Structures are given as structure tokens and as C-alpha cells.
Amino acid sequence: MNNKHPKNKAKSTTTPKTIALNKRARHEYHLIERHEAGLELQGWEVKAIRAGRANLGDGYAYVRDGEIFLIGAQITPLIQASTHVVANDRRTRKLLLHRRQIDTLIGRVQREGFTLVPTAMYWSKNRVKMEIALAKGKQAHDKRHAEKEREWQRDKQRIMRAHNRNA
């Protein structure tokens, strides 16, 4: 007998895995190294994230007292949010990392002049995780060079498609 629906089939999640992306980070920074970090969130923030109300556009991470905090990332509260909780959409949130990871990141930021930039927020086993990247700021000429490279890749693909259609 052919059973098409096994009992031990993994449940499909209804929420998409990626919550928010920081597309501007790739444009404005050279991303050197990426790390996964947890986020210390309040209940209303998790509900708002489930509703897709997170924005990483202006966010960055900084070091204070041997800990790493996220500032500038916006999580807009839901309209139905509780009245007894004051919801600050741009509050400072603590990033949860292992001590060894924190120490290496702090060292690279302080000694080598890197910046910590959030690049993505996503779900991992019903927990909100954030991908942060060690980054160096791009100069204006670097941005222009990257744009020219993207245009060339696009033109090259267009030429190859036209050539393959005619062949």
C-alpha cells in the first residue's frame, strides 16, 4: 500500500522565515563577517514582528559595558497593543551572543574600526534571530564601482540570453 501522507511529516510553517532585510547595508558597507544573534524582546514586539512590522533600515549595533545592543531598528507596535505597556518602537534592544563571540566582535570594532550592522531578521525554531555583520563603510567611488559592476553583469546576462535564443 502506497501511503502519500506519512504521519511523521514535519509541519509547514505559515510564517515566512525571513522577517526583514537591510538591503541598504550591502550598498553602504563592505560586509566582512556575519554572525547570528538572538534578540531580547518584549511580548508586544514579538506580536508585531509576527505581523511583519519590523524595519532594520536605520539600525546599527554598538558596544556598552561588554554587551552589544541594537539601536535604531524599528518595530512598530500593533494598534491592539496593551494600554498598560508603553511601546517605544525604536528602543534599544540587547543582542544575545556567546561571551567569546562578544569578545571577538568588541575587539574588531574597537581595534580595527569596524561597524556592526544588522543585515537580516528571521525566525529560527520559533525564536527571532538577527544576522549582524562586521562592516566597513564604503566611499562614494566604491559605490559607483559596485553599481557599474552590477550593470555590467545585467548587460552580460541580457547578451547571453539573446545569443542563446538565436543559437
UniProtKB/Swiss-Prot annotation:
The gene is smpB. Its main location: cytoplasm. This is SsrA-binding protein. One of its GO terms (molecular function) is RNA binding. Keywords: Cytoplasm, RNA-binding. Gene3D superfamilies: 2.40.280.10. It comes from Xylella fastidiosa (strain M12). Required for rescue of stalled ribosomes mediated by trans-translation. Binds to transfer-messenger RNA (tmRNA), required for stable association of tmRNA with ribosomes. tmRNA and SmpB together mimic tRNA shape, replacing the anticodon stem-loop with SmpB. tmRNA is encoded by the ssrA gene; the 2 termini fold to resemble tRNA(Ala) and it encodes a 'tag peptide', a short internal open reading frame. During trans-translation Ala-aminoacylated tmRNA acts like a tRNA, entering the A-site of stalled ribosomes, displacing the stalled mRNA. Pfam families: SmpB. One of its GO terms (cellular component) is cytosol. Transmembrane segments: none annotated. It is found in: Cytoplasm. Residues 144-158 have a biased composition (Basic and acidic residues). PANTHER family: SSRA-BINDING PROTEIN, TMRNA-BINDING COMPONENT OF TRANS-TRANSLATION TAGGING COMPLEX. Belongs to the SmpB family. Signal peptide: none annotated. One of its GO terms (biological process) is trans-translation. Residues 139-167 are annotated as: Disordered.
